[in-house]
Amino acid sequence: MQYLNAEGIVLDDGIIGKLEGFAVLLHEWNQVHNLTGARSVVAIYDNIVDSLYPLTFIRIPKTLLDVGTGAGFPGLVLAIALPETEVVLAEPLKKRVSFLKYAAIDLGLKNVTVEAKRVENVVYEAFDMISSRAVTNTKLLLDLTSRISDEHTEYLFYKGSRVFDEIAQVEGQMSYDIIQKNQRNYLYIKNET
């Protein structure tokens, strides 16, 4: 986890220990259940760093919904790093849901709720932040989450090279930044308050 300091991500030893525990756990489960394309521990660490990098520029939310969490990127990783943030992980695939629930218990994450459903079936009050990585295009993500967001909700979408085309498809004005790092474009849609 020496990569974290190089990226400007400062976490205490307890959180780093949980991130390392998550990496080992995911590597073990992935060998049997095929949860992610990250096959090695090094690849898992790279995904952890990718998940955490936005901590260098976002406002820390009190509540966070991660859409399509998959094997835990970025939602479970953010939950580990932000123990004061209530995190809801929305994931419809049963084998991933089983892993996420097990990992949350094993790592002692009291701030995590796993919803075994698609985001359009999630029922909550508005979240402070909604995140997603590799799920669908920006316009559809905003539409799917409109019932569980309000004018104060911010969005953190982990995007690839199509982010600029996707932004052009979104109607209306919004305040956003696109932070580029390697092949990743972090789309941070901010509220105006």
Curated annotation (Swiss-Prot):
Family stated for the protein in its record: Belongs to the methyltransferase superfamily. RNA methyltransferase RsmG family.
Reaction catalysis annotation: guanosine(527) in 16S rRNA + S-adenosyl-L-methionine = N(7)-methylguanosine(527) in 16S rRNA + S-adenosyl-L-homocysteine
EC assignment: 2.1.1.170
First-tier enzyme category under EC: transferase
Cited function: Specifically methylates the N7 position of guanine in position 527 of 16S rRNA.
Cellular component GO terms held in the UniProt record: cytosol
Superkingdom in the source lineage: Bacteria
Lineage of origin: Bacteria, Pseudomonadati, Campylobacterota, Epsilonproteobacteria, Campylobacterales
Protein name, entry field: Ribosomal RNA small subunit methyltransferase G
NCBIfam families: rsmG_gidB (TIGR00138)
Localization of this protein: Cytoplasm
Pfam families hit by this protein: GidB (PF02527)
One Gene Ontology MF term: rRNA (guanine-N7-)-methyltransferase activity
Keyword vocabulary terms for this entry: Cytoplasm, Methyltransferase, rRNA processing, S-adenosyl-L-methionine, Transferase
